[in-house]
């Protein structure tokens, strides 16, 4: 192995599995290199997966720990005033996970932009009559706005502190703020990924009659039961909402 990060390896294996048997993947290649947002999916997604695993380990330790104060040891007949209530381990993990998930949204939006840019023989804005129709331009605007918001939400809460209780509590973790920011990033990233799916399914239909893999074709067939191919301009947000609901079934 030339780069043995577990998340990268798992992502690469998953991509190969999902694309097995794809006619599109087997086509002769005309381009020397793909954009980073496609070529580096294992490296970027994998790093986020490694972060998720790390955060899971922190949370597993925390929920199996005693975080009371004071700590009571009945067998030793001891009551000890200590600091296990401090939320720093969780606060740092929440901030770290927010960054990792925001990056999944960030790279997803870049792929969405490439899909609507008229590259690789796809029509501009993924519609048959661009210019007359703005097609998928506005969903990409939406994704760009959301990822920009998530970047702001990635300012670490755990680097902040404010004293209370007459200075006795003079360093606090701000873990609850980190967690609420993380929750907003989770929802933002989910929406950005749904927009990418919306665009990718449209792009795949423009590749017909070539077929992708059996796994991808099955997923797209199920997706098309909820979200149609877009011929002309229409209100897009119901399709984005339907895409979110579909993602939650996977």
Where do the protein language model's features map onto the residues?
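C-terminal auxiliary extensions adjacent to catalytic cores
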Residues: 1-250
